[in-house]
Amino acid sequence: LKVVIVNDCAHVMEDLIPYLSSEFEIQFLQRTRGLWSKTFRLLWKIIKSDGDVYHVNYALQDAYLVDKFKHLDILYCHGSDVRWTIHSKEWGWIVKSNLKKAKVVLYATPDLKEHATKFREDAIYLPTPVKTDVFTPKQRYNNPLKAVYFKLPYEQLPLGLDIYLKQSNIALDILERNVPYEKMPETLKKYDVFVDRFSIPSFSKTCLEAMSSGLAVISYKDDCFSRVEELDIENIKKEGKTNRDFVEKNHDAKLVANQLSRIWRDVYD
């Protein structure tokens, strides 16, 4: 069974392909955000490709071109496409068209269900994968404790949280989102607490990777200031184990790959 995968998002397919390639013949058509790469070069790659099943990540031009020149079998929505872009005057029509025309629509985080099912009641939740054999539990904790927050384009760190962490003897590093993916496991292990996003009611992929690494998290689920008061070394160790168990049971890349392989076979059959 030949599967053509078009585009990637947050290294999701990069994480899944190693667990799928023994069963399927996979052609992975990647692109950059450059104008040429995401338009004419992408179109050429799609036209030249040959697959039994076409799987597209993200509901924009990639999916539209696959629908026009091949067959849009799987559309995997990852976030901003159905959360925000779908409402834009310029690109919303493409997202809606792709959702309606794909044979199967998948969504990566639980909060996307309400957005995807407005256009596809049969949309399926396929969890964001985490390579738990790469993001392994940390063994050493810092004294004083250290927290990390990655800057986001759509929200700011809650006002005063950095000061409150400092007063609680927790050092906070605020990082740009330019850490190479292969460096992320060792980067996360330098910290004890991961500060995630608050405006979106789901864990980011980096947060799940931090949880897999045994970090405690401050997230959308928390009142962030009262949450800080709970963060002593013993609680962090306990939460780290709980978080690791959660990711292993719900987001392990091998489990997600098994789910996706069943979906691919069902579409082909």
PLM regions: where:
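A charged, aromatic-enriched C-terminal amphipathic alpha-helix characteristic of glycosyltransferases
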Residues: 11, 230-269
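Active-site proximal beta-strand in glycosyltransferases
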Residues: 53-55, 69-85, 106
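Donor nucleotide-sugar binding/catalytic pocket of nucleotide-sugar-dependent glycosyltransferases
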Residues: 100-136
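Short hydrophobic beta-strand element within catalytic cores of glycosyltransferases
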Residues: 216-219
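Aromatic "clamp/platform" in nucleotide-sugar-dependent glycosyltransferases that forms part
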Residues: 198-199
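Short His-centered aromatic/hydrophobic patch
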Residues: 56-62
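Membrane-proximal helix-turn-helix segments that form the acceptor-binding/catalytic region
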Residues: 43-48, 88-105
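Conserved catalytic-core segment of nucleotide-activated headgroup transferases in glycan assembly
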Residues: 131-134, 140-181
